[in-house]
């Protein structure tokens, strides 16, 4: 998400673009051997190593949402997977048949590029389910990332109550030629990040002036046709949100110094996933940034337009 984080859950528009690396899913159906019908799910890292390997008896029973704060990572992942699998329509899993489902990431799982959202989009497509409903029942959140994974193009995303809406949107690659994404290696949990500021978001929702201000800034970013205008809008969005939610900007967290013409903005949940920076900022904080992995925005973000 380029702009709109957190506030998208209370009705403010958000702007998001897909990245090139994704996640694929293969499904094999075969006659069950002795011992009953089974479903085996194996999820693989970018390097091919398995990070999740679970086996379930069929048919599945519904499972309540996992409490991520009170479960081990493995227990949580198993419960989340079981819950998603249980959402299929009655009779979807054929009697006398077993299944093997294998997923493969094309990016590092710790990068925050969408391992969960691409999994939901892939499985919903396979099972004939509404991906937004699957997302809400399993993970919660706004669902913008699932919409991006489904559409495969940039979009403007907003919610009317619980209903997700989106339109196509693109951003000129000329405007982003000097942008870089900094991977911080501290993947954030979006559900927990939203939970931490839930009460403040509710207060923002009831502040008409603030909501109008956020919508206007997001609209300015959406329509920007000059680099300085676009970057100023992103910096303004971050400053308003930091003040409203009591969160630290990357300048505060990393003790970075603002520089004229520089851009440094959180991408994803604040505090660890990624930073968006431009060349001006990269030059001014070269020493501090050298320990992080960086890629050019235009090398990883897809479906942009060129003037």
Walk through the language-model features, giving the residues of each.
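Acyltransferase
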Residues: 169-223
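Glycine-rich, charge-dense phosphate/pyrophosphate-binding loop(s)
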Residues: 3-5, 9-11, 216-307
């Amino acid at each position: 998400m380029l702009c709109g984080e957190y506030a998208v859950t209370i009705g403010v528009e958000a702007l998001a673009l897909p990245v090139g690396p994704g996640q694929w899913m293969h499904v094999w159906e075969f006659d069950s051997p002795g011992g009953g019908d089974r479903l085996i799910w194996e999820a693989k890292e970018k390097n091919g190593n398995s990070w999740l390997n679970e086996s379930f008896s069929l048919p599945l029973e519904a499972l309540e949402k996992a409490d991520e704060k009170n479960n081990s990572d493995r227990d949580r992942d198993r419960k989340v997977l079981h819950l998603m699998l249980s959402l299929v329509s009655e009779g979807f899993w054929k009697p006398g048949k077993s299944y093997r489902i294998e997923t493969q990431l094309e990016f590092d799982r710790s990068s925050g590029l969408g391992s969960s959202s691409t999994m939901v989009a892939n499985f919903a497509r396979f099972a004939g389910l509404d991906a937004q409903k699957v997302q809400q029942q399993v993970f919660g959140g706004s669902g913008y990332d699932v919409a991006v994974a489904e559409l495969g193009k940039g979009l403007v995303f907003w919610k009317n109550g619980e209903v997700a809406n989106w339109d196509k949107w693109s951003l000129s690659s000329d405007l982003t030629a000097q942008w870089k994404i900094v991977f911080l290696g501290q993947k954030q949990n979006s559900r927990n990040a939203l939970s931490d500021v839930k009460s403040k978001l509710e207060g923002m929702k009831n502040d008409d002036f603030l909501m109008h201000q956020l919508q206007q800034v997001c609209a300015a970013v959406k329509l920007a046709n000059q680099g300085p205008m676009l970057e100023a809008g992103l910096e303004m969005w971050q400053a308003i949100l930091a003040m409203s939610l009591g969160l630290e900007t990357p300048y505060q967290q990393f003790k970075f110094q603002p520089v004229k013409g520089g851009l440094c903005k959180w991408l994803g949940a604040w505090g660890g996933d990624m930073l968006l920076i431009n060349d001006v900022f990269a030059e001014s904080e070269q020493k501090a940034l050298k320990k992080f992995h960086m890629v050019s925005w235009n090398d990883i973000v897809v479906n942009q337009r060129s003037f």
